[in-house]
Amino acid sequence: MQPQTTKYDQNASTNLDQDVNSSRLVKYAQNQTEIKEYLYAILSKEHPRLFEKYGPDFLAIDLAELLKDGEILCKLGSLLPASKVPNNPSTKFRSSKMPFVQMENISFFLSTCELVGLPHDEIFQTVDLYEAKDPYQVVITLMSFSRLANKIDASKFPHVVGARAARVKPNVPSKPFRLRTK
């Protein structure tokens, strides 16, 4: 009888968690430019000076670093119409260099996402962005937000980022034979 192998005996150079994390980081790198272009297209109309502090090539800045203070997220969330999001938390934005205020700004945007009905499993946690724990989850949230915001107000949110949600055709059962007319 052979001894049972343990995790210490394996010859694999990576484990499943590392593979998943590296896969998500690759997807993050692939999608962050599209997200930044979306944010610029939506926000530059209402807030033309918002991106000036990042310089002319803000597309070269990492998305997580760009969103870390919560300002861009709150400005995005505050564009939602008040009729659809009464008492919008994103309007409570405060500009600050203090970490707890920046994390609070991020949480204002996340509260707005919950209020508009974004699925809970598509909403990132504050540490996913602020500490860059899972930056791809931030991308997922912004993609989902873009789809939902487009449904709410297509005039302010004309663009959608990422794949469109599939519309499932409802399954209509056929009429039983005994009820069909002859």
Q: Language-model segments: what does each one mean?
A:
Residues M1-K182:
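Alpha-helical coiled-coil scaffolding segments
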